[in-house]
Amino acid sequence: MAKGQGRFRPLIRPSEPKPATLSFWNLVEAHVLRALRTEHGVSVKALRTALDYAERELRVERLLLSPELRSEAGQLFLERYGELIDLTASGQLAMKQVLEAHLRRVTWDDARFPIRLHPFVASGAGADEMVIAIDPAVSFGRPVVASRSVSTAVIVARIDAGERPVDIAADYGLSDADIEQAVLYERAA
């Protein structure tokens, strides 16, 4: 094997190993993983260390699904008992300065399992809005405008067919901003 090549355990475990099948939980894990890597600068090594430590020492089987997961300056933390445990430094306690934007976009049920994801659609103005939702219990998990459960793909198909966005908005009781978010989401996907 050439230098620098090797096999590593994946950061996200598929729900079914053979054939590799991804679940809704895997989608949420990928959403959080992408955010940690691209927006928070967490290295793969730090992620692997954190995942291993959380599983081995804290009995957290799916760290990327944990609503207590936090990130700051390329490090991962787990909030426990009002303190932050630094998962990338073998469990040292850390200060409570965290970025929670990505985890706030996940809706959790009473058993603390993820049930709905509101993916980011745009950066800058409007980035905090949660117009689009992915929910396995709605529209078979396809992206929808959350307020009315209207498929984003249907909205874009109608626009592509030549219909005016204002007419589509009126048909579904959506705002012009909802239509714009649906188009932005579908065009980015």
Residue ranges of predicted features:
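Long, charge-rich, low-complexity intrinsically disordered regions
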Residues: 6-7, 17-22, 29-161, 166-172, ...
